[in-house]
Amino acid sequence: MAHGPRYRVPFRRRREGKTNYHKRLALLKSGKPRLVVRKTLNHHVAQIVLYAPEGDKTVVSAHTRELMRDFGWKGHGGNTPSAYLLGLLIGYKALEKGIEEAILDIGLHPPTKGSSIFAVLKGAVDAGLNVPHSEEIYPGEERINGKHIAEYAKMLKEDDENYKKQFGGYLVKGLEPEKLPEHFEEVKARIIEKFEKVRA
């Protein structure tokens, strides 16, 4: 550990790799609700968060498990199509609560162009939530609807063992990964239908 009179111990959450306080301060200065997006290996989580002196207040939240439970999503919770659908869901939920604009908060995730984090953003914007951004950061349409996964599945199907190993999670739920784009559109339609009044 460093020593000397000029050494400063970083805040605990910074040491633990959980919070970038410089970024957080910049986001809070905007005065807008934050669209907080976090990703794990198997899932995405999105929240609309308001700052309060006593602690941040979560107004609405959505999890990819919700897509599976309430809308019949059979794909993986950590891929780009599920991220877009989650964004669509959190966007409609925010509008339902009267929140029409937000600023994106990706925490310590690297801002990689085309990443699934930005698929969540696209979904929220498509729902009608106003979030400042550049469209250049979005994933391509084929990644959003899962066509790239379907194409890979078609190629891998020739090797039955690897195919079942790679896509066992899809198959056990009754979804052929080659049909993921069609399934994506079905689930997207269900989300839109549920929030039809919000869109009106």
From Swiss-Prot:
Q: Which InterPro entries match?
A: Rbsml_uL18_euk (IPR005485)
Assembly and partners?
A: Part of the 50S ribosomal subunit. Contacts the 5S and 23S rRNAs.
Q: What is the protein's given name? A: Large ribosomal subunit protein uL18
Recorded family membership: Belongs to the universal ribosomal protein uL18 family.
Q: What is the role of this chain?
A: This is one of the proteins that bind and probably mediate the attachment of the 5S RNA into the large ribosomal subunit, where it forms part of the central protuberance.
Q: Which NCBIfam families match?
A: PRK08569.1
Q: Which UniProt keywords apply?
A: Ribonucleoprotein, Ribosomal protein, RNA-binding, rRNA-binding
Q: Which GO terms describe its molecular function?
A: 5S rRNA binding; structural constituent of ribosome
Q: Which GO terms describe its cellular component?
A: cytosolic large ribosomal subunit
Q: Which GO terms describe its biological process?
A: ribosomal large subunit assembly; translation
